[in-house]
């Protein structure tokens, strides 16, 4: 489909160019006669009017220069840090090149129509800001324009190049910083609208507790329960929150069959779940948190959370680093645009509650994507790599510093040093970006099989009777075997022996570790 679209676009554009239709509208084909560039005077009058508030824009430009410099440092250090992670990422989890392209329709994470809307706004804001700061510095704007490949993929403001060369360095830095700086402002505004206006108005549509995750091969998953279901009843007992769920589950026992009522995308459904043993689960996966009372208790294999906590974390993303990271990565969690299983959980209230639900969710999604793409455009353009804005800002900044530190140096020598530094930095940034794609494929980790296993000579016996335990059947390159016998005694070794002085039910826990301290846990129930 994409290939047919590509052929149709290129063929149609070249036909229109050959027939002279593009020239009539100040259009031309560039980059292999495949991309359409449109130059226009539209918008010049707006730029002229807005730029008359010279002092205001100069002060704003000063703030943007400082802000972009800080973002530049942060982004470069982030790329360096990400480069070091290549050795820890599984080869199978390598980033697809498509994920590095911020264009809707090509990047699978960015939805087409929300993406086009947000990208157009980001480009218009970015380029108009360049134009405004050009006029503030009395630099002529020759033209404005769009670069299109069926839909807009770029925009530009074309200042007079000769006048730009004669600008003071700080004024030119303001001009370049205006693009990413204005994108960050728009990102902040629409983040506020999304979080503090739209999401903050959400309230749970029904009482219940949200299924946050489902453990494979346990009762809930085997019965058909899935994440994002709202659990409303367990064994005919009403569940209003996570505390109710815990209290009800603590009254159940392993092997019990319970009825679970849920709302799935707003539709009521019933499930019968055979409960597993809670103690066994914790011994296998979280032995450090295991307590004796857990053994024999029912375990559904469902992690739950109150729905309002989900909405609160999105309404207040700055409350913690984890919330902010979750907020920015919503598209990768398949939570933006909001899916049906999310919208069914909440109802808009307050002033925005008068908006029809369908329009409310469209607005909320639009606000998020305008925030997200402006943030990405701003952060990317702040990178210290020509032809990005950050690269030009870095060049002027270094030139200014050399002028103060090495005032005796000739202008030609300064230019040579700056050009060399800028080239090295641009190549470094490009390498770091490409390394995110190819690095894990070259040096990433291979799949590792780790499966601890206990072979017990007997599982039932008398006090003082000797039990033998053998871990040689474990899968993996283990180097240490640590045993906990549940009575306060421990041992180390592939094969061990133990006897208990008192009767009771014990769980023997084996923690097997490899040379890199990766571990696998196994347990065995022993009756004395």
What are these regions (language model features)?
Residues 446-528:
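Extracellular/lumenal mature domains of secreted and surface-exposed proteins
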Residues 2-55, 73, 79-165, 373-402:
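Small-residue-rich helix-interface/hinge motifs
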Residues 20-22, 199-219, 443-449:
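Alpha-helical transmembrane signal-anchor/signal-peptide segments
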Residues 112-156, 163-208, 366, 420-425:
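Internal alpha-helical transmembrane segments
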Residues 43-60, 162-175, 408-414:
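Cytosolic juxtamembrane amphipathic/interface segments immediately preceding
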Residues 86-110, 264-379, 393-429, 437-446:
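Functional transmembrane alpha-helices
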Residues 221-244:
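Conserved PDZ fold ligand-binding element
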